[in-house]
Amino acid sequence: YGGSFTELGSYIMLPVLKLLGESYTNYRFESLRGENGLDVFTKLSFTYPHALATLTCGLGVKSEGRLLISGTTGYIVAEAPWWKTSYFEVHYEDASHVQKYSDTYLGDGLRYEISDFLTKLRGNESSNFKLTAEDSIFMADMMERFLVEQGRKI
């Protein structure tokens, strides 16, 4: 395999890209390397003018694998494995106010499942959340930046 980030990075970047966009002001990679020199765990942090995002992925590490989106008036949680989620909750400051969403997704594919998840989350049926060429270019650029920072050939 090529390491945690090259194997799993697109999965963890997609929800952040769809929710916060490409207009980050700073990013930072931190990795733990295995004996073979490849990353076994990588954390990617984005700084946006209005938000922070922390993404983690790992091969050879154990984690719960849930998606947590925190905001000023509440948070959204999709339990593991979040990339296959058919259920998520929106929690508000008032602990008794919890919105629960569930649906059965048709077909396979992470990008379609996340797209449907975001469509439901935002309350519209637009196709704006489908994986676009620009999304793919953004994620490929971040992969390239990671490889350069790791001293690996592109």
Where are these regions (language model features)?
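C-terminal helix-rich "cap/oligomerization" subdomain common to oxidoreductases
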Residues: 116-154
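Conserved anion/nucleotide-ligand pocket segment
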Residues: 1-13
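Active-site rim elements
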Residues: 2-3, 102, 126-128
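Surface-exposed loop/edge segments in extracytoplasmic proteins
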Residues: 95-100
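Active-site-adjacent helix/loop segment of glycosyltransferases
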Residues: 86, 92
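Active-site loop of classical SDR/Rossmann-like NAD(P)-dependent oxidoreductases
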Residues: 101-115, 131
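Contiguous beta-strand/loop segments that form the cofactor/metal-binding neighborhood of enzyme cores
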Residues: 12-85, 114-124
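Soluble or luminal CAZymes and related metallo-dependent hydrolases
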Residues: 8, 109, 135
